[in-house]
């Protein structure tokens, strides 16, 4: 069966999310919190635990391990420069033909850290993902901020 998509423009095939997150924590603490939150402490919708494996080196995988050799590859680490950059490329949570790039750029700002987040994608982005992706990243990025700002135990 062949399905045509009349009237599909470039804007229907692209996705761009940009967010700035101001964190009251050092650059190093914020970067470590980012790796933790995107890895073992990741959460899905409604705050449910969804731990991920994040191999934080160039070419490292970022994936959800479901056990028994099952899982879902979200992407690969395209670039990492501790503690100022981590960049991913891959399908992320989308199980259809899409190329995504996710960037976290960190810089010192007023005694804290500024995270500049950017998710750009190209391909057959389903409408449900288009609607939910901004809020989803907002939740993840807020959890990164909360983790970085929490008091350190002695």
Language-model features: where?
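Short acidic N-proximal helix/loop "leader" segments that mark the beginning
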Residues: 1-18
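A conserved amphipathic terminal alpha-helix motif
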Residues: 1-3, 121-154
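Short beta-edge strand/loop motif at the mouth of beta-sheet-based domains
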Residues: 18, 25, 36-73, 83-85, ...
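Hydrophobic/aromatic beta-strand elements that line small-molecule binding cavities or substrate pockets
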Residues: 19-21, 74-79, 100-108
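Short glycine/serine/proline-enriched coil/turn segments at secondary-structure junctions
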Residues: 69, 94-98, 140
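Mid-chain, well-packed structural core segment of small domains
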Residues: 85-104
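Short, solvent-exposed aromatic-acidic interface loops
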Residues: 92-95, 118-124
